[in-house]
UniProtKB/Swiss-Prot annotation:
GO terms for molecular function: chitin synthase activity. It comes from Verticillium dahliae (strain VdLs.17 / ATCC MYA-4575 / FGSC 10137) (Verticillium wilt). It is a multi-pass membrane protein. The chain crosses the membrane at residues 566-586, 625-645, 658-678, 712-732, 740-760, 840-860, 881-901. Pfam families: Chitin_synth_1, Chitin_synth_1N. Residues 41-56 have a biased composition (Basic and acidic residues). Its EC number is 2.4.1.16. CDD domains: Chitin_synth_C. It catalyses: [(1->4)-N-acetyl-beta-D-glucosaminyl](n) + UDP-N-acetyl-alpha-D-glucosamine = [(1->4)-N-acetyl-beta-D-glucosaminyl](n+1) + UDP + H(+). This is Chitin synthase 1. Polymerizes chitin, a structural polymer of the cell wall and septum, by transferring the sugar moiety of UDP-GlcNAc to the non-reducing end of the growing chitin polymer. Plays a role in cell wall integrity and is involved in tolerance to hyperosmotic conditions. Required to successfully penetrate the host plants and thus plays a key role in pathogenicity.
Amino acid sequence: MAYRGGGPNDYEGHDLQDLPPGSGNGSRDEGVDDVGQSLLRDPHARGTSPYEHHLGAQEPPARPVSAYSLTESYAPDAGSRTPAPPPDNFGVGTGYSQELDPQNGGFGYGRPASTVDTDESWVRRQQPGAQTGGLKRYATRKIKLQQGSVLSIDYPVPSAIKNAVQPKYRDVEGGSEEFMKMRYTAATCDPNDFTLKNGYDLRPRMYNRHTEVLIAITYYNEDKNLLSRTLHGVMQNIRDIVNLKKSTFWNKGGPAWQKIVVCLVFDGIEKADKNVLDVLATVGIYQDGVVKKDVDGKETIAHIFEYTSQLSVTPNQQLIRPVDDGPSTLPPVQFIFCLKGKNSKKINSHRWLFNAFGRILNPEICILLDAGTKPSPRSLLALWEGFYNDKDLGGACGEIHAMLGKGGKKLLNPLVAVQNFEYKISNILDKPLESSFGYVSVLPGAFSAYRFRAIMGRPLEQYFHGDHTLSKILGKKGIDGMNIFKKNMFLAEDRILCFELVAKAGQKWHLSYIKAAKGETDVPEGAAEFISQRRRWLNGSFAASLYSLMHFGRMYKSGHNLIRMFFFHIQLIYNVLNVIFTWFSLASYYLTTSIIMNLVGTPTEASADSSAHTAWPFGDSATPIINSILQYLYLAFLVIQFVLALGNRPKGSKFTYIASFIVFGFIQTYILVLSGYLVARAFNTPIGDQISLESGKAFVDSFFGGDNAAGVILVALVTIYGLNFIASFMYLDPWHMFHSFPYYLVLMSTYINILMVYAFNNWHDVSWGTKGSDKAEALPSAHISKGEKGEEAVVEEIDKPQEDIDSQFEQTVRRALEPFKEVEEVEKRDVEDSYKSFRTGLVVSWLFSNAALIVFITTDDFNAFGFSDDPNGRSAAFFSFLLYSTAVLALVRFTGFLWFLGKTGIMCCIARR
């Protein structure tokens, strides 16, 4: 199809032509239903263009084809080679490879050294006239500033981009420039001052459109594959919403796509991958040579680009554009791209989202995504439906699962399998339980949604106390005035927002988990990266959990009814018990290990109540010795973890940490084997002889009391293992129990012995693993000039001709579609010495309280205190208490899961569509 244009200044002279079958190779990206390839051709170049053969045209077109039209092939079964380029008029080849290598995303352009993208080359491209080597002089135009200080300029987009828009969306007669111009605004203010009163505005509001859903993608330094995965997934989800046929909401009051805005917030220019900017430029929401470092000496805090595009780039660098009106065609998407001048962390990015853009657009729902998280089909619709069907729902999250690779090949990595199981069980047991109570302790920032009016006010005010750019304004309430405990709390800032939302005075907002919404994210695959990530998670969640427990009294000022408050109190008790068990988990794991070794490895003589047992598995002589060696090895590696955590970075001790995972995994495997032997030995005696059914009292006494082990073991097997299997099968998602659960059983002790030890020993480190940057890029400035007679302030801006815009775009697309080669960077972290004293006190109190519990359970000398003089008796009592407590907590989780599953099934039947 080719759009023939309207007026002479609109789209004339720039066609979009489809390739005939067999002209290229279209490798299909997994999970992507729209496959296309972008090829650029230049018929005006000397000799035969390297792209001429891709067109496959047998005769010249009726009129000249644009030098920079986007031409796509939808022939996935076509051959993988194209004809080799003939020499040019000088008898020399073009220098570009013509092979479409499937491993290269279907684009095999050889790239001259001059186009290799680096930070330096990106900075050079921002200078005026950089694309022409500075030799060409452009005409200029005068741009009036809004209210005398706000610089907002409309720039023509490349012809190929505006030609990609379907004709039915182009309002040429109405004079709309939505698809013809990209809008750039240099925000020289704080996000709180980005208001209509101060002269700032956004396109959707200027077009008088109601924004129902604002989708935010926060970015730090991810590569273009990760961003493309998120961005393309979002556009596919928007297509799902637009294609709804029977919706009573989306199909009234204007097209559905006009009610959705996608906002990308980049945390600083310096750390951003410049290849990602090329991808955004290919879509149409960014251009080189536009950004201004300052406006008349006032520093630009954020560069804001706005455009509505129908183009998308897949993770394997394939350009997708509309070809027909079929259901697979992507609709127009309204984009806001906020490129912050400096790195100021994720909370500040959310302040731009909520306080700047949110207040102008006033959306009903805000959906938060991290770059790299791919929403599954119809997931964003499922999140929105949750709010649409529940007027009191203030926040929600979906299921996040680990990216396992093609055919699940990443599951061969034990760390990936362990994290996959952790995510799955959290989604099956933990989130449904908390959702049943009405308070989900954490809505992951990588995939969650909030009702905008629910978080306005105190929730966002408390949340933004963690923004270091507000530290001078907030004073003692800001991040610089906080103690180390509060600073750690803001490492898990999403937990703070969740608590403040539920506890909002006079309101009855609750939080929910939505099963139908699913998102896929990549997880750390190396030990060092895994440990560093969990340091922030564990410390932040521990501090935030204590914060919510200490401030539970604020719930009484909310508007929740008595039934909801009753369940909040049950959840409070459950959370207190979880915090206590987490605190003493270091001792619990060691005691469990030593008790099981002693039970199996100590020979016993026959008595009236039990038969004789030899030490297992190595005999009476060798087994106690081997068990003692393993216990000492356990303690030795535990001490090593403290030494490593206090003085080394995970990346600097990578092999030692890998050895620690192996040692603890080996000991845990040995314990699992011994546990299996204990179970078999306990059931050597028929269970009917061990448990009495004569009366209720006799059953309770024989099952839970006495010397019989069958009751304790049955409870442990059913609650620790059985409920996981039952819940997973009822959830219709049991596969992780087969391919990931065994890995988790082997490595579960490392969550405490390695991850928590490292986290608590680095309590003083309140960094995100990223540091703020004060480096200002060498970008051009905008200088204000005024006329002699008090004329309005204006800025002179280059008026670049369309041919030069298109020429620049050709190079941009080449860079964008090049495969990304990952460069490993050395992480640098500054340790704050002033926090080490607090860190030391925390670690010592934690270590000594756990050591005291071990001594109390195992020592022989407690006669003076009135305790039993038999340490084996105390060990058995502790072990029974531990198992029963774990069983009770597991039953509570399972009950919440059952309630959630039933409620979800009923709501599916009665919910409004």
